[in-house]
């Protein structure tokens, strides 16, 4: 009886996955010559190149910026404030992408916070924030906290005995960093990179809003344009399959090298990093944690500030907002229940 139930559930969810593909293939007409011409088109080449380029840069910058932040947090992970920061690092899963877009404009735009106080546009000879600069900033703000959480996860899996041995052998700070902590980060670096690369490669709202024109269009945006405006489902589906293939390729290679670790076990009350009490290390860690926390969580801070300062909360109590809120609540709760049961 148990196995019959399992097969029934598997069959049901298999249908849910396969039926959309049946609908997709019913819309496409395969013509090898047209497919060949489409992939030989210079516009298609530019779409593929820019999609890979912006995703690669975004993922690389997010990962490299996350490493010093994760290392600083790991050295003081027994503090309650660090646990709170680590919890906040998962906000990329719950914050709407459009809020990141608004935050980039409010903070880095022509009339934004940084330009108003530091006159960045004139000092750095910047004409506009829109384009590759805005896309990279938005992806960094969205994905660096996520990368920090994953790298912290890797560091958190280092056995306490390793630190005790390191301390007893009087290994230097850089020796400890290069021989113990960096290898643990390195073993999952490409996995984290591949996840963030896929997220940036599939990015839609950020590229659509901050791209600034067709020059900075990606495959995801082109699929939307072909399907909605040109009603050319052949091109949209071809690009979709190309996108799926590229993402699966990176994810397969990334997860092939994945090493397991303790994702939620942050509590190590007796944890004492061998070098955390050094005055210079304390100052550097403090500056890193404060700077990265302010910069990476600036979208949340910006949204809350404008929400309260402009009295937006007063306009939310209306029929339209409440209807949208309850629709979202019903969909999310129902989806959560179905996924949990399955």
Regions inferred by a protein language model and the residue ranges of each:
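Flexible interhelical linker loops that connect adjacent transmembrane helices
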Residues: 257-288
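Outer-membrane beta-barrel domain signature
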Residues: 167, 246-266
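Membrane-water interface segments at the C-terminal ends of transmembrane alpha-helices
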Residues: 2-31, 42-156, 184-211, 238-255, ...
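Glycine-rich helix-loop "coupling/hinge" segments at transmembrane-helix boundaries
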Residues: 205-231
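Short helix-to-coil transition segments within interhelical loops
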Residues: 158-185, 229, 317
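Solenoid-repeat scaffolds in large eukaryotic assemblies
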Residues: 166, 235-236
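A short amphipathic helical element positioned immediately N-terminal to and/or at the very start
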Residues: 32-40, 177-178, 311-317
């Amino acid at each position: 009886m148990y196995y019959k139930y399992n097969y029934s559930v598997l069959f049901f969810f298999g249908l849910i996955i396969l039926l959309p593909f049946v609908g997709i293939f019913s819309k496409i007409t395969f013509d090898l010559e047209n497919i060949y011409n489409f992939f030989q088109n210079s516009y298609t080449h530019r779409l593929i190149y820019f999609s890979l380029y912006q995703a690669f840069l975004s993922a690389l910058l997010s990962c490299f910026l996350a490493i010093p932040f994760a290392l600083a947090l790991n050295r003081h992970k027994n503090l309650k404030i660090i646990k709170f920061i680590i919890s906040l690092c998962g906000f990329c899963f719950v914050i709407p992408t459009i809020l990141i877009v608004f935050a980039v404009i409010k903070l880095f735009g022509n009339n934004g916070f940084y330009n108003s106080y530091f006159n960045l546009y004139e000092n750095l000879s910047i004409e506009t924030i829109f384009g590759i600069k805005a896309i990279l900033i938005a992806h960094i703000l969205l994905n660096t906290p996520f990368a920090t959480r994953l790298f912290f996860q890797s560091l958190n899996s280092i056995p306490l005995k390793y630190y005790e041995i390191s301390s007893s052998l009087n290994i230097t700070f850089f020796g400890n960093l290069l021989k113990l902590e960096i290898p643990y980060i390195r073993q999952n670096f490409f996995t984290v990179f591949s996840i963030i690369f896929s997220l940036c490669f599939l990015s839609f709202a950020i590229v659509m809003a901050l791209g600034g024109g067709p020059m900075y269009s990606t495959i995801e945006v082109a699929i939307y344009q072909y399907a909605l405006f040109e009603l050319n489902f052949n091109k949209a589906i071809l690009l979709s399959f190309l996108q799926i293939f590229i993402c699966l390729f990176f994810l397969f290679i990334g997860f092939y090298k994945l090493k397991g670790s303790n994702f939620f076990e942050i509590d190590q009350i007796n944890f004492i990093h061998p070098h955390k009490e050094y005055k210079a290390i304390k100052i550097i860690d403090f500056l890193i944690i404060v700077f990265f926390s302010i910069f990476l969580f600036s979208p949340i801070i910006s949204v809350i500030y404008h929400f309260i300062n402009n009295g937006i909360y007063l306009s939310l109590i209306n029929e339209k907002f409440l209807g949208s809120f309850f629709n979202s609540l019903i969909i999310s709760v129902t989806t959560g229940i179905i996924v949990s049961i399955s």
